[in-house]
């Protein structure tokens, strides 16, 4: 009985993690495409409502345009690790490689995003 319960917990956990990974994959791909196109509206729509209120569309515009002019296109995102609900990626731009930290809300919207030097 214990093993059946343990197996059920493992299968359920694996299913939840797979759904979580799929949400992150979808969001990172959309962010990369919209960042490179400098589609501010599309990037803004990826943000959770709380982030939209906090950053405003003008703030997102400054963030995207500033990063794009300084770093170039975002060529590749490579998963590094997940810790405390935040996924870390190596973000390879034309001019620099940075670490991108990303946290999604339960709806798959960006709750936190930041770039920093490795």
Across the structure, where does each feature detected by a protein language model lie?
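Surface-exposed, charged secondary-structure patches
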Residues: 64-107
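Short helix-adjacent coil turns
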Residues: 31, 35-42
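Short, low-complexity N-terminal intrinsically disordered segments enriched in polar/charged residues
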Residues: 6, 11-33
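A short, surface-exposed interaction/processing loop segment used at functional sites
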Residues: 109-118
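Positively charged n-region of N-terminal signal peptides that target proteins for export
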Residues: 1-4
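Short solvent-exposed beta->alpha transition segments
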Residues: 25-26, 41-81
């Amino acid at each position: 009985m214990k093993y059946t319960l343990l197996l059920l917990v493992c299968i359920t956990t694996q299913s939840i993690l797979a759904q979580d990974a799929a949400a992150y994959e979808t969001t990172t791909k959309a962010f990369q495409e919209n960042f490179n196109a400098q589609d501010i509206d599309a990037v803004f729509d990826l943000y959770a409502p709380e982030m939209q209120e906090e950053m405003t569309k003008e703030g997102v515009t400054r963030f995207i345009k500033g990063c794009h002019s300084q770093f170039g296109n975002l060529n590749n995102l490579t998963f590094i690790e997940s810790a405390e609900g935040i996924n870390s990626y190596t973000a390879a731009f034309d001019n620099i490689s940075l670490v991108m930290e990303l946290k999604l809300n339960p709806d798959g919207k960006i709750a936190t995003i930041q770039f920093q030097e490795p």
